[in-house]
Amino acid sequence: MISELEKKILKSLNENARKSFREVAKEVGTSTTAKYNNVKKMEKRGLLQGYVPAVDEELLGFTLTAIIAMRISQGKLYNVYDKIIKYPEVREIYDLTGEWDAILVCFFKKRRDLDNFLKTKLNLPHIERVMTHVVLNVIKDEKRAFIEAL
């Protein structure tokens, strides 16, 4: 679990990760040194894993998002994961229960790129079946940490 002070620090950073140590310390009611030490402890524990910008993929030219479900031969999940984890188009991989073994979230610039990805990069041994969904609209895409429920 996390302390109340850590929770306050995380909420503050979640609103704006570019805040200075001094700003966050003032906001959460602690000294700059205490805030710094708490952040370092959270990083060491793996609770804070980095600081990355939230980027709009469409502004980078990635206008096509595909959700790809895969059925993989029994016992071969990690053989497939070891390959697809390296593909830059694959932004997220979810290991599932149920009819499908994995879901990929992928970004592409053009339909042709998606077509090529499906026909070449996902043409792997042990991938038995693939079902692709093209995203029409993104209703919610929350990039901030899930802290509000703590």
Indicate where each model-derived feature is located.
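A compositional/biophysical signature of low hydrophobicity enriched in polar/charged and small residues
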Residues: 1-150
